[in-house]
Amino acid sequence: MIIVKDNFCEDVEELRKLALSQDYIMHRYFPGGSVAWRGFRTWELTYLNNPLIQKYAEKILNLAYETYNLKDQALHKFFHISYEEHKQNRIREWHTDPTSHAGVLYLTPNPSSESGTTIFLDGKRNDIKNKYNRLVMYPGKNKHGISSFFGDSKESGRMTFTFFISDREKFKRDLSELNKLRERHDHGYSNRYFKF
């Protein structure tokens, strides 16, 4: 089942401002090998300990619990920005995630509506349109990907709050590994961060 919820955040402008203020790393510089995503992504956002991020992480988890009958899950969360130019850097158009569920919250005002998320469910292609403050959530095992890209700057690019839901033990292991990568990366490659 695919969840689509419009007007998800009461204070979406504050969340967008927070996203614009973060450091990002480009896909080609992400440590640990090749990644399926293209563009710029923050490190996992738990380390910020930000009340706004925690508020929406809890809201997303509660929606997942109610809809998918999940228990004892945790949420990996990132801000992600991609530009029109990133469509040429795609290794694979569609992918799956090794998590129970995944999703995005669109954070670009007045986006290209065709730049949403394509999700394959029961053999059928579903093109969910990009709309500011729209949440989309789906099972991670279903093939999915960005429908199309747009923009060429932090203000005009395709911005999302991207999340992955998994059981708490997997979350702890994954977060520990991500933090180790971040610490190693911070010591030797801080010049590869993309600061707007």
Predicted features and spans:
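Peripheral, non-catalytic segments flanking oxidoreductase cores
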Residues: 1-17, 23, 28-33, 166-196
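Catalytic core of non-heme Fe(II) oxygenases with the double-stranded beta-helix
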Residues: 82-196
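Non-heme Fe(II)/2-oxoglutarate
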Residues: 2-81, 88-91
